[in-house]
Amino acid sequence: LKVKGNQLYQYPVEEMNKTKRLLEEKAEKINGLVTLHQPDENAYELEILLPENQQGILYLLANKERTRYLKVDFDSERGFVEVDRTNVGIGKMNETKSTRQSKFLPNKELKMNIFVDTSSVEIFFNDGLKVLSSLAFPEKEDTFIFLKMKESHVSTRLFKIE
């Protein structure tokens, strides 16, 4: 935890940087639904930088058909994000608290650092200003990462966590 300008920031311990290696880096224009990455397993960090005033959906822990997934709805114009684990993996989550929501400054670019393993997802927004965590139990083959947006440039980096 760190305090910057009267704001509390939360971020993983520095030792995490020593256990990861870059697998793939992309900068591309997105229009519609695309497969961003498909890691071999669910043990990774995904860093994604989204421009200001954009809306879209990020699907994590997804199968190829997108019938199982963890969904991240984002709107950088309104400054809103929602994480929904209702359709993730083994015995889809039918709980009352399957969604998490957060607000941040509107009309700004949105950076997400997403840490995924076989039982949890942690999303750090804008370098740890906001954090959402959730349990998730995907099937082993549910490693697809999809992004759905309209005409936007997106930068991503995918790291394997050893």
Predicted regions mapped to residue ranges:
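Beta-rich accessory regions
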Residues: K2-E162
